[in-house]
Amino acid sequence: MTTVQEAVPNLIPTQDVTPRPAPKKVEAGVKLRGAEKVARIPVKIIPTEELPKKPDWIRVRIPVSPEVDRIKQLLRKHKLHSVCEEASCPNLGECFSGGTATFMIMGDICTRRCPFCDVGHGRPKPLDLDEPKNLAIAIADLRLKYVVITSVDRDDLRDGGAQHFADCIREIRALSPGVQLETLVPDYRGRMDVALEITAQTPPDVFNHNLETVPRLYKAARPGSDYDWSLDLLQKFKQMVPHVPTKSGLMLGLGETDEEVIEVMHRMREHDIDMLTLGQYLQPSRNHLPVQRFVHPDTFAWFAEEGYKMGFKNVASGPLVRSSYHADQQAHEAKIKL
Protein backbone atom coordinates (compact mmCIF):
# COMPACT_ATOMS: atom_id res chain seq x y z
CA MET A 1 0.00 0.00 0.00
CA THR A 2 1.22 3.49 -0.80
CA THR A 3 2.44 5.35 2.28
CA VAL A 4 1.21 8.81 3.23
CA GLN A 5 4.61 10.23 2.34
CA GLU A 6 4.54 8.62 -1.11
CA ALA A 7 1.02 9.85 -1.79
CA VAL A 8 1.57 13.33 -0.37
CA PRO A 9 5.23 14.29 -0.91
CA ASN A 10 5.02 17.60 0.98
CA LEU A 11 4.33 15.76 4.24
CA ILE A 12 7.00 14.45 6.62
CA PRO A 13 6.45 12.47 9.87
CA THR A 14 6.88 14.41 13.11
CA GLN A 15 10.02 12.44 13.97
CA ASP A 16 11.75 14.52 11.29
CA VAL A 17 14.56 16.41 13.05
CA THR A 18 14.39 19.59 10.97
CA PRO A 19 14.35 22.57 13.41
CA ARG A 20 11.10 24.49 13.55
CA PRO A 21 9.57 27.16 15.79
CA ALA A 22 8.14 26.05 19.12
CA PRO A 23 4.34 25.77 19.02
CA LYS A 24 2.61 28.88 20.28
CA LYS A 25 0.85 28.59 23.62
CA VAL A 26 -2.89 28.42 23.07
CA GLU A 27 -4.90 30.91 25.11
CA ALA A 28 -8.68 30.92 25.38
CA GLY A 29 -10.29 32.94 22.61
CA VAL A 30 -7.08 33.27 20.55
CA LYS A 31 -7.37 31.90 17.02
CA LEU A 32 -4.35 30.16 15.46
CA ARG A 33 -4.12 29.88 11.69
CA GLY A 34 -1.58 28.82 9.09
CA ALA A 35 1.75 27.52 10.39
CA GLU A 36 0.80 28.09 14.05
CA LYS A 37 -2.34 25.99 13.65
CA VAL A 38 -0.60 22.94 12.17
CA ALA A 39 2.53 23.06 14.36
CA ARG A 40 1.52 20.02 16.45
CA ILE A 41 -0.21 17.73 13.95
CA PRO A 42 1.16 14.15 13.53
CA VAL A 43 2.39 14.72 9.98
CA LYS A 44 4.50 17.79 9.34
CA ILE A 45 3.64 20.07 6.42
CA ILE A 46 6.38 21.77 4.45
CA PRO A 47 4.99 25.13 3.26
CA THR A 48 4.31 25.20 -0.46
CA GLU A 49 6.63 27.59 -2.27
CA GLU A 50 3.97 28.54 -4.78
CA LEU A 51 0.28 27.68 -4.92
CA PRO A 52 -0.59 25.64 -8.03
CA LYS A 53 -2.27 27.35 -10.95
CA LYS A 54 -5.94 26.44 -11.13
CA PRO A 55 -7.19 24.86 -14.37
CA ASP A 56 -9.64 26.63 -16.64
CA TRP A 57 -12.64 24.78 -15.21
CA ILE A 58 -12.09 26.34 -11.77
CA ARG A 59 -13.02 29.99 -12.05
CA VAL A 60 -14.81 31.74 -9.20
CA ARG A 61 -16.71 34.99 -9.54
CA ILE A 62 -15.53 37.71 -7.14
CA PRO A 63 -18.25 38.12 -4.48
CA VAL A 64 -19.23 41.75 -5.01
CA SER A 65 -22.91 42.65 -4.70
CA PRO A 66 -25.22 44.57 -2.35
CA GLU A 67 -26.70 41.25 -1.16
CA VAL A 68 -23.27 39.97 -0.10
CA ASP A 69 -22.69 43.10 1.96
CA ARG A 70 -26.19 42.93 3.44
CA ILE A 71 -25.79 39.36 4.65
CA LYS A 72 -22.34 40.06 6.11
CA GLN A 73 -23.75 43.05 8.00
CA LEU A 74 -26.65 40.97 9.29
CA LEU A 75 -24.27 38.26 10.50
CA ARG A 76 -22.17 40.83 12.36
CA LYS A 77 -25.29 42.44 13.84
CA HIS A 78 -26.40 39.16 15.41
CA LYS A 79 -22.83 38.07 16.32
CA LEU A 80 -23.02 35.11 13.96
CA HIS A 81 -20.46 33.34 11.78
CA SER A 82 -20.85 31.76 8.35
CA VAL A 83 -18.71 28.84 7.27
CA CYS A 84 -18.78 30.52 3.85
CA GLU A 85 -16.43 33.20 5.20
CA GLU A 86 -14.47 31.24 7.82
CA ALA A 87 -13.58 28.37 5.47
CA SER A 88 -12.98 30.64 2.45
CA CYS A 89 -15.62 28.81 0.39
CA PRO A 90 -15.30 29.45 -3.38
CA ASN A 91 -19.10 29.69 -3.70
CA LEU A 92 -19.52 32.55 -1.21
CA GLY A 93 -20.42 35.06 -3.89
CA GLU A 94 -23.05 32.87 -5.54
CA CYS A 95 -24.70 31.79 -2.28
CA PHE A 96 -24.63 35.20 -0.59
CA SER A 97 -25.89 36.88 -3.75
CA GLY A 98 -28.77 34.41 -3.75
CA GLY A 99 -29.67 35.38 -0.19
CA THR A 100 -28.55 32.16 1.49
CA ALA A 101 -25.80 31.24 3.93
CA THR A 102 -24.50 28.29 5.90
CA PHE A 103 -24.31 29.28 9.54
CA MET A 104 -21.45 28.15 11.79
CA ILE A 105 -22.41 27.93 15.45
CA MET A 106 -20.46 27.61 18.71
CA GLY A 107 -17.90 30.22 17.74
CA ASP A 108 -15.19 30.45 15.11
CA ILE A 109 -12.41 28.62 16.98
CA CYS A 110 -12.07 24.85 16.43
CA THR A 111 -10.46 22.39 18.84
CA ARG A 112 -9.04 20.36 15.92
CA ARG A 113 -6.08 21.21 13.68
CA CYS A 114 -7.13 19.72 10.32
CA PRO A 115 -4.56 21.03 7.81
CA PHE A 116 -6.98 21.18 4.86
CA CYS A 117 -9.32 23.56 6.68
CA ASP A 118 -9.06 27.35 6.91
CA VAL A 119 -11.04 27.67 10.16
CA GLY A 120 -8.84 28.81 13.06
CA HIS A 121 -7.73 26.51 15.91
CA GLY A 122 -7.53 27.27 19.60
CA ARG A 123 -9.27 27.10 22.96
CA PRO A 124 -12.84 28.24 22.32
CA LYS A 125 -14.74 30.65 24.50
CA PRO A 126 -17.80 29.41 26.44
CA LEU A 127 -20.95 28.93 24.39
CA ASP A 128 -23.03 32.01 23.68
CA LEU A 129 -26.39 31.12 25.22
CA ASP A 130 -28.07 33.81 23.12
CA GLU A 131 -26.81 32.32 19.85
CA PRO A 132 -29.82 30.04 19.17
CA LYS A 133 -32.23 32.97 19.49
CA ASN A 134 -29.99 35.32 17.47
CA LEU A 135 -29.63 32.70 14.75
CA ALA A 136 -33.39 32.22 14.60
CA ILE A 137 -33.96 35.97 14.30
CA ALA A 138 -31.39 36.28 11.49
CA ILE A 139 -32.96 33.41 9.54
CA ALA A 140 -36.41 34.95 9.94
CA ASP A 141 -35.07 38.34 8.79
CA LEU A 142 -33.59 36.71 5.68
CA ARG A 143 -36.82 34.77 5.03
CA LEU A 144 -34.84 31.64 4.26
CA LYS A 145 -36.61 28.41 3.33
CA TYR A 146 -33.62 26.06 3.65
CA VAL A 147 -30.81 26.51 6.15
CA VAL A 148 -27.59 24.60 6.76
CA ILE A 149 -26.13 24.77 10.27
CA THR A 150 -22.61 23.56 10.90
CA SER A 151 -20.09 24.08 13.68
CA VAL A 152 -16.51 23.99 14.72
CA ASP A 153 -15.41 20.92 16.68
CA ARG A 154 -15.98 21.45 20.40
CA ASP A 155 -14.07 18.67 22.13
CA ASP A 156 -14.22 20.79 25.30
CA LEU A 157 -17.97 20.16 25.68
CA ARG A 158 -19.36 17.02 27.33
CA ASP A 159 -21.86 16.45 24.52
CA GLY A 160 -19.66 17.85 21.75
CA GLY A 161 -22.21 20.63 21.23
CA ALA A 162 -25.20 18.41 20.38
CA GLN A 163 -27.52 20.22 22.80
CA HIS A 164 -26.56 23.58 21.29
CA PHE A 165 -27.51 22.24 17.85
CA ALA A 166 -30.86 21.09 19.27
CA ASP A 167 -31.45 24.48 20.91
CA CYS A 168 -30.80 26.21 17.58
CA ILE A 169 -33.22 23.90 15.76
CA ARG A 170 -35.99 24.57 18.29
CA GLU A 171 -35.53 28.36 18.20
CA ILE A 172 -35.44 28.45 14.39
CA ARG A 173 -38.57 26.34 14.00
CA ALA A 174 -40.39 28.51 16.54
CA LEU A 175 -39.82 31.66 14.44
CA SER A 176 -39.80 30.05 10.98
CA PRO A 177 -42.09 26.98 11.12
CA GLY A 178 -41.77 26.20 7.41
CA VAL A 179 -37.98 26.26 7.21
CA GLN A 180 -36.06 23.07 6.41
CA LEU A 181 -32.90 22.50 8.43
CA GLU A 182 -29.78 20.54 7.54
CA THR A 183 -27.11 20.04 10.20
CA LEU A 184 -23.49 19.38 9.25
CA VAL A 185 -22.15 18.01 12.52
CA PRO A 186 -18.69 17.15 13.90
CA ASP A 187 -17.79 13.56 14.71
CA TYR A 188 -18.65 13.84 18.43
CA ARG A 189 -15.44 11.98 19.25
CA GLY A 190 -15.91 9.98 22.46
CA ARG A 191 -19.43 11.38 22.87
CA MET A 192 -21.41 9.62 20.15
CA ASP A 193 -24.09 7.99 22.31
CA VAL A 194 -25.04 11.07 24.32
CA ALA A 195 -24.86 13.30 21.23
CA LEU A 196 -27.11 11.04 19.16
CA GLU A 197 -29.65 10.68 21.98
CA ILE A 198 -29.97 14.48 22.05
CA THR A 199 -30.06 14.74 18.25
CA ALA A 200 -32.73 12.07 17.87
CA GLN A 201 -35.06 14.02 20.17
CA THR A 202 -34.81 17.15 17.99
CA PRO A 203 -33.74 15.86 14.58
CA PRO A 204 -32.96 18.06 11.58
CA ASP A 205 -34.48 17.50 8.15
CA VAL A 206 -31.11 16.29 6.82
CA PHE A 207 -28.25 14.89 8.94
CA ASN A 208 -24.82 15.54 7.39
CA HIS A 209 -21.33 14.54 8.53
CA ASN A 210 -18.39 14.60 6.13
CA LEU A 211 -15.85 11.80 5.85
CA GLU A 212 -13.65 14.36 4.00
CA THR A 213 -11.11 11.91 2.52
CA VAL A 214 -10.14 8.25 2.09
CA PRO A 215 -8.97 6.29 5.16
CA ARG A 216 -5.35 6.07 4.00
CA LEU A 217 -5.02 9.85 4.26
CA TYR A 218 -6.75 10.33 7.61
CA LYS A 219 -3.56 10.72 9.65
CA ALA A 220 -2.41 13.51 7.35
CA ALA A 221 -5.74 15.24 6.71
CA ARG A 222 -7.92 14.55 9.77
CA PRO A 223 -5.66 14.17 12.83
CA GLY A 224 -7.79 13.26 15.83
CA SER A 225 -10.56 11.73 13.72
CA ASP A 226 -11.38 8.14 12.82
CA TYR A 227 -12.84 6.93 9.52
CA ASP A 228 -14.86 4.04 10.95
CA TRP A 229 -16.14 6.20 13.81
CA SER A 230 -17.53 8.70 11.31
CA LEU A 231 -19.25 5.96 9.32
CA ASP A 232 -20.76 4.54 12.50
CA LEU A 233 -22.03 7.98 13.54
CA LEU A 234 -24.00 8.30 10.31
CA GLN A 235 -25.36 4.76 10.43
CA LYS A 236 -26.41 4.92 14.09
CA PHE A 237 -28.29 8.16 13.51
CA LYS A 238 -30.08 6.56 10.55
CA GLN A 239 -31.06 3.60 12.72
CA MET A 240 -32.46 5.95 15.37
CA VAL A 241 -34.27 8.31 12.96
CA PRO A 242 -34.82 6.30 9.75
CA HIS A 243 -37.04 8.88 8.02
CA VAL A 244 -34.32 11.59 8.00
CA PRO A 245 -31.89 11.49 5.03
CA THR A 246 -28.19 11.16 5.86
CA LYS A 247 -25.46 12.83 3.87
CA SER A 248 -21.66 12.85 3.62
CA GLY A 249 -18.94 14.22 1.38
CA LEU A 250 -15.34 13.94 0.21
CA MET A 251 -12.72 16.40 -0.99
CA LEU A 252 -10.72 15.17 -3.98
CA GLY A 253 -7.17 16.16 -4.78
CA LEU A 254 -5.38 15.24 -1.53
CA GLY A 255 -3.58 12.23 -2.97
CA GLU A 256 -6.40 9.69 -3.13
CA THR A 257 -6.93 7.39 -6.11
CA ASP A 258 -10.17 6.98 -8.04
CA GLU A 259 -10.36 3.39 -6.81
CA GLU A 260 -10.15 4.56 -3.19
CA VAL A 261 -12.97 7.04 -3.78
CA ILE A 262 -15.19 4.30 -5.22
CA GLU A 263 -14.41 2.07 -2.24
CA VAL A 264 -15.40 4.82 0.21
CA MET A 265 -18.63 5.36 -1.73
CA HIS A 266 -19.43 1.66 -1.36
CA ARG A 267 -18.74 1.86 2.40
CA MET A 268 -21.07 4.86 2.64
CA ARG A 269 -23.90 2.91 1.06
CA GLU A 270 -23.20 -0.04 3.38
CA HIS A 271 -23.75 2.44 6.24
CA ASP A 272 -27.08 3.65 4.82
CA ILE A 273 -25.91 7.09 3.67
CA ASP A 274 -28.47 8.59 1.27
CA MET A 275 -26.75 11.66 -0.21
CA LEU A 276 -23.20 12.34 -1.42
CA THR A 277 -21.14 15.42 -2.25
CA LEU A 278 -17.78 15.33 -4.07
CA GLY A 279 -15.72 18.46 -4.67
CA GLN A 280 -12.22 19.63 -5.51
CA TYR A 281 -9.89 20.43 -2.62
CA LEU A 282 -8.45 23.94 -2.97
CA GLN A 283 -5.43 24.78 -0.83
CA PRO A 284 -6.31 27.83 1.34
CA SER A 285 -2.67 28.89 1.89
CA ARG A 286 0.90 27.71 1.49
CA ASN A 287 0.75 26.28 5.04
CA HIS A 288 -2.13 23.93 4.27
CA LEU A 289 -2.08 20.47 2.69
CA PRO A 290 -0.87 20.71 -0.90
CA VAL A 291 -3.14 19.96 -3.85
CA GLN A 292 -1.97 16.71 -5.45
CA ARG A 293 -4.23 16.83 -8.51
CA PHE A 294 -7.07 18.79 -10.07
CA VAL A 295 -9.81 16.31 -10.87
CA HIS A 296 -11.34 16.82 -14.32
CA PRO A 297 -15.09 17.56 -14.54
CA ASP A 298 -15.55 14.40 -16.60
CA THR A 299 -14.19 12.35 -13.70
CA PHE A 300 -16.57 14.08 -11.30
CA ALA A 301 -19.42 13.21 -13.68
CA TRP A 302 -18.29 9.58 -13.73
CA PHE A 303 -18.28 9.45 -9.92
CA ALA A 304 -21.86 10.77 -9.96
CA GLU A 305 -22.95 8.06 -12.40
CA GLU A 306 -21.34 5.38 -10.25
CA GLY A 307 -22.95 6.84 -7.14
CA TYR A 308 -26.44 6.61 -8.58
CA LYS A 309 -25.74 3.01 -9.62
CA MET A 310 -24.85 2.27 -5.98
CA GLY A 311 -28.18 3.63 -4.81
CA PHE A 312 -27.44 7.13 -3.54
CA LYS A 313 -30.62 9.21 -3.65
CA ASN A 314 -28.67 12.31 -4.72
CA VAL A 315 -25.08 12.91 -5.81
CA ALA A 316 -23.61 16.40 -6.21
CA SER A 317 -20.22 15.97 -7.86
CA GLY A 318 -18.14 18.75 -9.41
CA PRO A 319 -15.03 20.88 -8.90
CA LEU A 320 -16.78 23.61 -6.90
CA VAL A 321 -19.29 21.42 -5.06
CA ARG A 322 -19.25 21.83 -1.28
CA SER A 323 -21.42 20.24 1.42
CA SER A 324 -23.98 23.02 1.48
CA TYR A 325 -23.84 24.02 -2.19
CA HIS A 326 -27.42 23.88 -3.55
CA ALA A 327 -28.24 21.79 -0.47
CA ASP A 328 -31.93 22.65 -0.80
CA GLN A 329 -32.09 21.09 -4.27
CA GLN A 330 -30.22 18.00 -3.07
CA ALA A 331 -32.57 17.49 -0.15
CA HIS A 332 -35.64 17.94 -2.33
CA GLU A 333 -34.46 15.31 -4.82
CA ALA A 334 -33.39 12.90 -2.07
CA LYS A 335 -36.69 13.10 -0.20
CA ILE A 336 -38.65 12.50 -3.38
CA LYS A 337 -36.75 9.22 -3.78
CA LEU A 338 -36.90 8.10 -0.13
Swiss-Prot record:
GO molecular function: 4 iron, 4 sulfur cluster binding; lipoate synthase activity; metal ion binding
Region (Disordered): 1-22
Chief localisation class: cytoplasm
UniProt cross-references to InterPro entries, sorted A to Z: Aldolase_TIM, Elp3/MiaA/NifB-like_rSAM, LIAS_N, Lipoyl_synth, rSAM
Location within or outside the cell: Cytoplasm
Catalytic activity: [[Fe-S] cluster scaffold protein carrying a second [4Fe-4S](2+) cluster] + N(6)-octanoyl-L-lysyl-[protein] + 2 oxidized [2Fe-2S]-[ferredoxin] + 2 S-adenosyl-L-methionine + 4 H(+) = [[Fe-S] cluster scaffold protein] + N(6)-[(R)-dihydrolipoyl]-L-lysyl-[protein] + 4 Fe(3+) + 2 hydrogen sulfide + 2 5'-deoxyadenosine + 2 L-methionine + 2 reduced [2Fe-2S]-[ferredoxin]
Binding sites annotated in the UniProt record for [4Fe-4S] cluster 1: C84, C89, C95, S324
PROSITE patterns: RADICAL_SAM (PS51918)
Any one Gene Ontology cellular component term annotated for this protein: cytoplasm
Keywords recorded for this protein, A-Z: 4Fe-4S, Cytoplasm, Iron, Iron-sulfur, Metal-binding, S-adenosyl-L-methionine, Transferase
Lineage: Bacteria, Pseudomonadati, Pseudomonadota, Gammaproteobacteria, Pseudomonadales
Gene3D superfamilies (alphabetical): Aldolase class I
Pfam families: LIAS_N (PF16881), Radical_SAM (PF04055)
CDD domains for the chain: Radical_SAM
Enzyme Commission number: 2.8.1.8
Protein name: Lipoyl synthase
Domain Radical SAM core span(s) in chain numbering: 96-313
Cofactor: [4Fe-4S] cluster
Alphabetized NCBIfam families for the sequence: lipA (TIGR00510), PRK05481.1 (NF004019), PRK12928.1 (NF009544)
Cofactor notes: Binds 2 [4Fe-4S] clusters per subunit. One cluster is coordinated with 3 cysteines and an exchangeable S-adenosyl-L-methionine.
Binding site for [4Fe-4S] cluster 2: C110, C114, C117
Family, per entry: Belongs to the radical SAM superfamily. Lipoyl synthase family.
Superkingdom as given in the UniProt entry: Bacteria
Pathway: Protein modification; protein lipoylation via endogenous pathway; protein N(6)-(lipoyl)lysine from octanoyl-[acyl-carrier-protein]: step 2/2
